[in-house]
Swiss-Prot record:
Disulfide linkage: none
Compartment annotation: Plastid, Chloroplast
Targeting presequence: 1-45
UniProt-listed Enzyme Commission number(s): 4.2.1.20
GO BP: any one term: L-tryptophan biosynthetic process
Keyword match Isomerase: no
Protein name, UniProt field: Tryptophan synthase beta chain 2, chloroplastic
Keywords, in A-Z order: Amino-acid biosynthesis, Aromatic amino acid biosynthesis, Chloroplast, Lyase, Plastid, Pyridoxal phosphate, Transit peptide, Tryptophan biosynthesis
Length: 443
């Protein structure tokens, strides 16, 4: 689609304030930032406009050969959204095959760890997406898109994967529904996630190594899109995050919003209210959007996303797109992007393969610009420390992606009033990362 457009100048930042619970309070936002593409004011996060945009972000920057497939996909998605039979089938599979709903777990020892000397501190809960079949949140979307592909008559499925969890989830559902499965994965990611590569192949998927670029998630996504362009008539692309061209950001979010809906219901059951703070890691941003979306209109609920700072955001080894990026186009969508002055993509770095991506979902960019969500970053070492800390305190080995969110508790908890309820999305389990962590941690 050509080089990314230059980053806009003169963007006003939203003023912020905090109440005693550390929650965001309303402040002025740039009118341009909160206007949808059709000129209507956006009351937070809703559906994108007719062009697939959230404010200035999103859209369809794709070859003409893909436009029909995207239009067909959007039409099918909207039709199935009101199809009771489809919803019943999906709900049944999520319950009996995936194992939903996932628990909202009170992390008692982690809560105790962050208490102050006077015994006060926040209460920490984990949304246990790591307990889903295949070990992460990714299967929520994979199951739904596989069902959608069947309705479209597509028997060949392709997907990209970084950490391997989306690849495993896609391979799993393809076996469940008898579909052909091809997974694109960066050669570097295949080395650090060898266990997941074996799992995908055990499940009958063809895993194609991508050696171009840095041989990571960005390059795997590019190859998957090339495949789709070539085989669009027979193939459905199960994109694994809230990125890519419209309708994928909206559609993947809708398939993951079960995370936030369950969290709201479980919070009401457990303490008769809502969470005060929601925390999730952000690469492309699907697990965070799945948790956040339900609460975007609840202005008293604070939304915090954590990106990968790698070796530090002031080095050239990080993946902190929302912290350091500029607006550009990647993989069919306009969003914040790590790029140089010439609009060329800067290669990201993270110890976590799932966060090692130079872009981010357009809705996250929109939430950042309107000031509804806040984004920070966590270094490799901080994530490794949290990986070990949570394993030792709670007997839960989190994914390195999740560990970025858990690491932020070190910074967040001292700022919160007593009794503030924090929900961290435990987006995946860390079995896949034990080999990587063992190179850095002394246990």
């Amino acid at each position: 689609p050509g080089p990314p457009p230059p980053a806009p100048e003169g963007r006003r930042r939203r003023g912020r304030g905090r109440n005693a619970a550390g929650q965001a309070v309303a402040a002025e936002a740039s009118p341009a930032a909160v206007e949808m593409g059709n000129g209507a004011a956006a009351p937070g996060l809703q559906r994108p406009d007719a062009m697939g945009r959230f404010g200035r972000f999103g859209g369809k920057y794709v070859p003409e050969t893909l436009m029909h497939a995207l239009t067909e996909l959007e039409s099918a998605f909207h039709a199935l959204a009101t199809d009771d039979e489809f919803q019943k089938e999906l709900d049944g599979i999520l319950k009996d095959y995936v194992g939903r709903e996932s628990p909202l777990y009170f992390a008692e020892r982690l809560t105790e760890h962050y208490k102050r000397a006077d015994g006060t501190g926040p209460l920490i809960y984990l949304k246990r997406e790591d307990l889903n079949h295949t070990g992460a949140h990714k299967i929520n979307n994979a199951v739904a898109q596989a069902l959608l592909a069947k309705r479209l008559g597509k028997q060949r499925i392709i997907a990209e994967t970084g950490a391997g969890q989306h690849g495993v989830a896609t391979a799993t559902v393809c076996r469940r529904f008898g579909l052909q499965c091809i997974i694109y994965m960066g050669a570097q990611d295949m080395e650090r996630q060898a266990l997941n590569v074996f799992r995908m192949r055990l499940l009958g998927a063809e895993v194609r190594a991508v050696h171009s670029g840095t041989a990571t998630l960005k390059d795997a996504t590019s190859e998957a899109i090339r495949d789709w362009v070539t085989n669009v008539e027979t193939t459905h692309y199960i994109l694994g995050s809230v990125a890519g061209p419209h309708p994928y950001p909206m559609m993947v979010r809708e398939f993951h919003k079960v995370i936030g809906k369950e969290t709201r219901r479980q919070a009401m059951d457990k303490w008769g209210g809502k969470p005060d703070v929601l925390v999730a890691c952000v690469g492309g941003g699907s697990n965070a959007m799945g948790l956040f979306h339900e609460f975007v209109e609840d202005q008293d609920v604070r939304l915090v996303g954590l990106e990968a700072a790698g070796h530090g955001v002031d080095t050239d080894k990080h993946a902190a797109t929302l912290t350091k990026g500029q607006v550009g186009v990647l993989h069919g969508s306009m969003s914040y992007l790590l790029q140089d002055d010439d609009g060329q993509v800067i290669e990201p770095h993270s110890i976590s393969a799932g966060l090692d991506y130079p872009g981010v979902g357009p809705e996250h960019s929109f939430l950042k610009d309107i000031g509804r969500a806040e984004y920070d970053s966590v270094t490799d070492q901080e994530a490794l420390d949290a990986f070990k800390r949570v394993s030792r305190l709670e007997g839960i080995i989190p994914a390195l992606e999740t560990s970025h969110a858990l690491a932020y508790l070190e910074k967040l908890c001292p700022t919160l009033a007593d009794g503030v309820r924090v929900v961290v999305n435990c987006s995946g389990r860390g079995d896949k990362d034990v080999h990587t962590a063992s190179k850095y941690l002394d246990v």
